[in-house]
């Protein structure tokens, strides 16, 4: 019996690091952001439909995320058109992974799991969490966005407290050792049959 575990959490909470910990425990991982990256890359399934809808968004035969951000900033309605192209392709990618993976636990790393209703396809959901001030400090330390951009992203996401309240597991990512211990405990519980698919 394959167990489907959704992994979610807001920006800067340590989701990618936590996802790798599940892989270290023998779980198979599907990463929504990586799937979009594949679709946007040269030869990816999203390139042709995006070129048809937004010709300027395709640069060197790949979809340019910076150009897409600019398009969305200029025309907020463009986001719905982009999602209408990308979401079905992401769903196909996820289904291919689900149907071909051989691990007993499949982890689906999906930042907007609850926002998109994806939890319905999961047997359980784990949410990563740290206090808001630590979240902000982590994101700012990356040096990849301004404080205003961070606040804009955070405003679009469901509050992390709500994500945690709706999840079966909350993984506090204050330290690597603490996070790893929680991941190992979740995997143990699932494999022992304490959490049913």
UniProtKB/Swiss-Prot annotation:
Q: Where can this protein be found? A: Cytoplasm
Please provide, in alphabetical order, the Gene Ontology terms of the cellular component aspect for this entry. cytoplasm
Q: Which InterPro entries does the entry link to?
A: Depp_CoAkinase, P-loop_NTPase
Q: What's the source species for this entry? A: Ruegeria pomeroyi (strain ATCC 700808 / DSM 15171 / DSS-3) (Silicibacter pomeroyi)
Q: In which pathway does it act?
A: Cofactor biosynthesis; coenzyme A biosynthesis; CoA from (R)-pantothenate: step 5/5
Indicate what this protein is called per its UniProt record: Dephospho-CoA kinase
Keyword match Membrane: no
State the source organism's domain of life.
Bacteria
């Amino acid at each position: 019996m394959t167990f489907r575990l959704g992994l979610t959490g807001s920006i800067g909470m340590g989701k990618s690091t936590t996802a790798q910990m599940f892989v270290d425990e023998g779980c198979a991982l599907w990463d929504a952001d990586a799937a979009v990256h594949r679709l946007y890359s040269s030869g990816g399934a999203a390139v042709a439909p995006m070129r048809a809808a937004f010709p300027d968004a395709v640069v060197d035969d790949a979809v340019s995320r910076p150009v897409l951000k600019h398009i969305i900033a200029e025309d907020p309605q463009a986001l719905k058109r982009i999602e209408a192209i990308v979401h079905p392709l992401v769903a196909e990618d996820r289904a291919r992974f689900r149907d071909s993976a051989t691990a007993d636990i499949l982890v689906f790393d999906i930042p907007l799991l609850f926002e998109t209703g994806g939890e319905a396809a999961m047997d359980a959901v784990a949410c990563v969490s740290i206090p808001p001030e630590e979240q902000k400090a982590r994101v700012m330390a990356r040096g990849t966005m301004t404080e205003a951009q961070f606040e804009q992203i955070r405003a679009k996401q469901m509050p992390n407290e709500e994500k945690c309240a709706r999840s079966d597991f909350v993984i506090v990512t204050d330290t690597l050792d603490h996070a790893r211990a929680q991941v190992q405990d979740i995997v143990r519980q699932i494999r022992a049959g304490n959490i049913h698919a």
